[in-house]
Amino acid sequence: MKGKKLSLVSSLLLALSALLIVASVFFPYWKMVFFAPQYPEGLNIIVFPNKLEGEIDIVNGLNHYIGMENFSAENFPELNYLLYIMIGLAVITLLTAIIRKKAMLYGVIGLFGILGILGVYDLSRALKKFGTNLDPMAPIKIDPFVPPILGHNTVANFVTESMLGYGTYFLIAAFILLLIPLWKDRKR
Protein backbone atom coordinates (compact mmCIF):
# COMPACT_ATOMS: atom_id res chain seq x y z
CA MET A 1 0.00 0.00 0.00
CA LYS A 2 2.90 2.33 0.73
CA GLY A 3 3.95 2.26 -2.93
CA LYS A 4 0.74 4.03 -3.97
CA LYS A 5 1.07 7.04 -1.64
CA LEU A 6 2.44 10.40 -2.69
CA SER A 7 5.34 11.86 -0.74
CA LEU A 8 4.82 14.71 1.70
CA VAL A 9 6.62 17.10 -0.68
CA SER A 10 4.29 16.05 -3.50
CA SER A 11 1.32 16.56 -1.22
CA LEU A 12 2.53 20.09 -0.45
CA LEU A 13 2.92 20.79 -4.18
CA LEU A 14 -0.67 19.67 -4.71
CA ALA A 15 -1.86 21.94 -1.90
CA LEU A 16 0.00 24.83 -3.52
CA SER A 17 -1.61 23.92 -6.84
CA ALA A 18 -5.06 24.11 -5.19
CA LEU A 19 -4.17 27.52 -3.79
CA LEU A 20 -3.12 28.75 -7.25
CA ILE A 21 -6.41 27.52 -8.72
CA VAL A 22 -8.34 29.52 -6.10
CA ALA A 23 -6.14 32.58 -6.66
CA SER A 24 -6.76 32.35 -10.41
CA VAL A 25 -10.45 33.20 -10.07
CA PHE A 26 -9.59 36.70 -8.84
CA PHE A 27 -7.70 37.56 -12.02
CA PRO A 28 -8.64 37.77 -15.72
CA TYR A 29 -8.34 34.58 -17.74
CA TRP A 30 -8.24 36.28 -21.14
CA LYS A 31 -8.47 39.69 -22.72
CA MET A 32 -8.72 41.40 -26.05
CA VAL A 33 -7.61 44.98 -26.68
CA PHE A 34 -8.93 46.96 -29.65
CA PHE A 35 -6.69 49.69 -31.06
CA ALA A 36 -7.67 52.28 -33.68
CA PRO A 37 -6.61 55.83 -34.56
CA GLN A 38 -9.51 57.17 -32.50
CA TYR A 39 -8.66 54.79 -29.59
CA PRO A 40 -4.85 54.75 -29.40
CA GLU A 41 -4.97 53.73 -25.72
CA GLY A 42 -7.07 50.71 -26.65
CA LEU A 43 -10.47 49.40 -25.63
CA ASN A 44 -10.52 46.28 -23.46
CA ILE A 45 -12.71 43.24 -23.14
CA ILE A 46 -11.49 41.43 -20.04
CA VAL A 47 -12.82 37.96 -19.23
CA PHE A 48 -12.87 36.73 -15.64
CA PRO A 49 -14.30 33.31 -14.75
CA ASN A 50 -17.56 34.95 -13.65
CA LYS A 51 -17.81 38.35 -15.39
CA LEU A 52 -16.77 40.58 -18.26
CA GLU A 53 -15.06 43.92 -17.68
CA GLY A 54 -13.59 46.70 -19.78
CA GLU A 55 -15.00 49.23 -22.20
CA ILE A 56 -17.64 46.77 -23.37
CA ASP A 57 -20.33 49.38 -24.09
CA ILE A 58 -18.00 51.29 -26.42
CA VAL A 59 -16.86 48.08 -28.15
CA ASN A 60 -20.49 46.98 -28.58
CA GLY A 61 -21.37 50.39 -30.02
CA LEU A 62 -18.60 50.05 -32.58
CA ASN A 63 -19.35 46.40 -33.34
CA HIS A 64 -22.95 47.38 -34.12
CA TYR A 65 -21.69 49.03 -37.32
CA ILE A 66 -20.30 45.75 -38.65
CA GLY A 67 -23.30 43.74 -37.44
CA MET A 68 -21.57 41.87 -34.65
CA GLU A 69 -23.59 40.61 -31.71
CA ASN A 70 -23.07 42.42 -28.39
CA PHE A 71 -20.53 41.17 -25.90
CA SER A 72 -22.43 40.60 -22.66
CA ALA A 73 -22.58 38.17 -19.78
CA GLU A 74 -25.87 36.87 -21.21
CA ASN A 75 -24.03 35.71 -24.33
CA PHE A 76 -21.53 33.75 -22.25
CA PRO A 77 -23.48 31.30 -20.05
CA GLU A 78 -20.14 29.83 -18.93
CA LEU A 79 -19.72 32.85 -16.69
CA ASN A 80 -22.61 31.54 -14.57
CA TYR A 81 -20.79 28.34 -13.60
CA LEU A 82 -17.06 28.55 -14.43
CA LEU A 83 -16.21 29.99 -11.02
CA TYR A 84 -17.85 26.98 -9.33
CA ILE A 85 -16.02 24.54 -11.60
CA MET A 86 -12.69 26.15 -10.69
CA ILE A 87 -13.46 26.08 -6.95
CA GLY A 88 -14.52 22.43 -7.33
CA LEU A 89 -11.23 21.65 -9.09
CA ALA A 90 -9.33 23.34 -6.27
CA VAL A 91 -11.23 21.30 -3.65
CA ILE A 92 -10.57 18.02 -5.50
CA THR A 93 -6.88 18.96 -5.81
CA LEU A 94 -6.70 19.75 -2.09
CA LEU A 95 -8.42 16.46 -1.22
CA THR A 96 -5.84 14.67 -3.37
CA ALA A 97 -3.09 16.46 -1.43
CA ILE A 98 -4.63 15.31 1.86
CA ILE A 99 -5.40 11.71 0.86
CA ARG A 100 -2.10 11.39 -1.06
CA LYS A 101 -3.21 8.64 -3.47
CA LYS A 102 -1.49 8.45 -6.86
CA ALA A 103 -4.70 7.25 -8.50
CA MET A 104 -6.45 10.44 -7.39
CA LEU A 105 -3.59 12.51 -8.81
CA TYR A 106 -4.03 10.83 -12.20
CA GLY A 107 -7.73 11.69 -12.05
CA VAL A 108 -7.06 15.33 -11.15
CA ILE A 109 -4.52 15.68 -13.97
CA GLY A 110 -7.00 14.16 -16.42
CA LEU A 111 -9.81 16.41 -15.21
CA PHE A 112 -7.58 19.48 -15.38
CA GLY A 113 -6.53 18.57 -18.93
CA ILE A 114 -10.12 17.98 -20.06
CA LEU A 115 -11.25 21.29 -18.55
CA GLY A 116 -8.37 23.10 -20.24
CA ILE A 117 -9.21 21.61 -23.63
CA LEU A 118 -12.90 22.45 -23.18
CA GLY A 119 -11.98 26.01 -22.17
CA VAL A 120 -9.89 26.57 -25.30
CA TYR A 121 -12.59 24.99 -27.46
CA ASP A 122 -15.30 27.14 -25.88
CA LEU A 123 -13.34 30.36 -26.36
CA SER A 124 -12.55 29.51 -29.99
CA ARG A 125 -16.22 28.63 -30.60
CA ALA A 126 -17.36 31.96 -29.13
CA LEU A 127 -14.83 33.95 -31.17
CA LYS A 128 -15.92 32.17 -34.35
CA LYS A 129 -19.59 32.81 -33.53
CA PHE A 130 -19.03 36.52 -32.94
CA GLY A 131 -16.84 37.02 -36.01
CA THR A 132 -18.83 35.01 -38.54
CA ASN A 133 -22.47 35.63 -37.57
CA LEU A 134 -22.55 39.21 -38.80
CA ASP A 135 -25.85 40.95 -39.52
CA PRO A 136 -26.16 41.30 -43.31
CA MET A 137 -28.11 44.54 -42.78
CA ALA A 138 -25.23 46.20 -40.90
CA PRO A 139 -24.22 49.68 -42.10
CA ILE A 140 -20.62 48.59 -42.79
CA LYS A 141 -20.04 45.38 -44.74
CA ILE A 142 -16.97 43.33 -43.92
CA ASP A 143 -16.01 39.75 -44.62
CA PRO A 144 -16.60 37.34 -41.74
CA PHE A 145 -13.51 36.77 -39.62
CA VAL A 146 -12.38 34.80 -36.58
CA PRO A 147 -10.42 36.75 -33.96
CA PRO A 148 -7.43 34.75 -32.69
CA ILE A 149 -7.28 33.39 -29.14
CA LEU A 150 -3.72 34.73 -28.97
CA GLY A 151 -2.07 37.32 -31.15
CA HIS A 152 -3.02 40.12 -33.50
CA ASN A 153 -5.84 40.60 -35.98
CA THR A 154 -6.86 43.53 -38.19
CA VAL A 155 -10.45 44.32 -39.13
CA ALA A 156 -11.08 47.60 -40.96
CA ASN A 157 -9.08 50.22 -39.05
CA PHE A 158 -9.03 48.20 -35.81
CA VAL A 159 -6.11 46.11 -34.69
CA THR A 160 -6.94 43.64 -31.95
CA GLU A 161 -4.51 41.97 -29.62
CA SER A 162 -5.67 38.87 -27.76
CA MET A 163 -3.75 37.59 -24.75
CA LEU A 164 -3.94 35.37 -21.71
CA GLY A 165 -4.67 36.96 -18.36
CA TYR A 166 -2.88 36.38 -15.07
CA GLY A 167 -5.57 33.90 -14.00
CA THR A 168 -4.62 31.61 -16.87
CA TYR A 169 -0.94 31.83 -15.93
CA PHE A 170 -1.87 30.80 -12.39
CA LEU A 171 -3.73 27.81 -13.84
CA ILE A 172 -0.75 26.84 -15.98
CA ALA A 173 1.50 27.01 -12.90
CA ALA A 174 -1.06 24.94 -10.95
CA PHE A 175 -1.03 22.29 -13.69
CA ILE A 176 2.77 22.15 -13.71
CA LEU A 177 2.68 21.65 -9.93
CA LEU A 178 0.36 18.68 -10.53
CA LEU A 179 2.83 17.13 -12.95
CA ILE A 180 5.91 17.41 -10.72
CA PRO A 181 4.72 14.65 -8.33
CA LEU A 182 4.36 12.26 -11.28
CA TRP A 183 8.08 12.58 -11.92
CA LYS A 184 9.14 12.97 -8.28
CA ASP A 185 7.22 9.94 -7.02
CA ARG A 186 7.61 7.78 -10.14
CA LYS A 187 9.34 4.98 -8.19
CA ARG A 188 7.11 5.08 -5.12
Features from the language model and the residues they span:
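N-terminal signal-anchor transmembrane alpha helix
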Residues: 8-35
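Long, glycine/tryptophan/cysteine-rich extracytoplasmic
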Residues: 26-78, 125-162
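Low-complexity, Gly/Pro
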Residues: 25, 83-86, 105, 120
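Juxtamembrane loop-transmembrane helix junctions in multi-pass integral membrane proteins
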Residues: 1-8, 74-77, 99-103, 155-165
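Interfacial segments of alpha-helical transmembrane regions
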Residues: 5-18, 92-119
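Membrane-interface capping segments at transmembrane-helix boundaries
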Residues: 5, 183-188
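Residue-level signal for alpha-helical transmembrane segments in multi-pass membrane proteins
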Residues: 20-27, 96, 118, 122, ...
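Hydrophobic alpha-helical transmembrane segments
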Residues: 16-20, 77-99, 168-179
